Each structure stands twice: as structure tokens, then as C-alpha cells.
Amino acid sequence: MKKAGILNRHLAGALAELGHGDGVLVCDAGMPVPDGPRVVDLAFRAGVPSFAEVVDGLLAELVVEGATAATEVREANAECAALLDGLFPALALVPHERLKELSAGARLIVRTGEARPYANVLLRCGVFF
């Protein structure tokens, strides 16, 4: 049995399959999930696990070269906006509708139990060398 890192076997396996340039959408419980990308649904109850917890866990295991979020997060969810700004100084912002369109091209979608609006970020995988 694994003793550290991401223990969810579906998520750990999906992360191992990612490559440079692949997209990973980390989303709240209300984000529409498009057909196509692989989905690992971690939502258990409203707020569990939180968006911040999941992003933190993913960043411990992934190299991220870019991140995109919805412009609306700035006004609708200041706490999430501050988190994203702190983690991703070069955060790109697009309208929420555009983020939903971009999510269709993600390789992986990780759905959290987050119950606050616009807690979504599309990560672009980098390389460790």
C-alpha cells in the first residue's frame, strides 16, 4: 500500500499518464463536466475535499507550466482568487464560458467537493527538466 502522496488509485494512475502540455482541470462541484476527458470525481460532501486541498496535493506531484482560471473568480470568490494568485503569479484569466470550452480539451478533470463559485483552474503540465 502506498504511504504518501495521492492515495486515490484512480487519480494517482491518471497523473502518471500525463505528459508535457496536457491539461488538468481542477473544478468545483458545480462546474459542468464535458464528455471526453477522463474524470476523477473526488467530491464527497459539499466542501469536501476543498478546492485548495486538491490543488495543493496536485502541485506536490505535478510540474505546472501554466494555469488558467475564470475572470469571474476575482469578484465572486476572493479567497480562491487570492489562492490562485499566490500559487500562479502568471495566472491567465478568461471568461467562465471560455474556461468551460477549454476544459473540453483537458486530458484529466478532477472534481472536488468545493461549494463556492468559480473555484476552477486549468493547469498545463510542464516537464521536470
Curated annotation (Swiss-Prot):
Positions that bind substrate: D28, H96, Y118, A119, N120
Recorded protein name is: D-ribose pyranase
Q: Which organism is it from?
A: Streptomyces coelicolor (strain ATCC BAA-471 / A3(2) / M145)
Gene designation per UniProt: rbsD
Could you say which protein family the record assigns here? Belongs to the RbsD / FucU family. RbsD subfamily.
**Which biological process terms from the Gene Ontology are attached to this UniProt entry?**
D-ribose catabolic process
Which of UniProt's keywords are assigned here?
Carbohydrate metabolism, Cytoplasm, Isomerase
Active site per UniProt: H20 (proton donor)
EC numbers for this chain? 5.4.99.62
Task: Identify one Pfam family in the record.
Answer: RbsD_FucU
Q: Which Gene3D superfamilies match?
A: RbsD-like domain
Q: Which top EC class is given?
A: isomerase
Q: Which HAMAP family match?
A: D_rib_pyranase
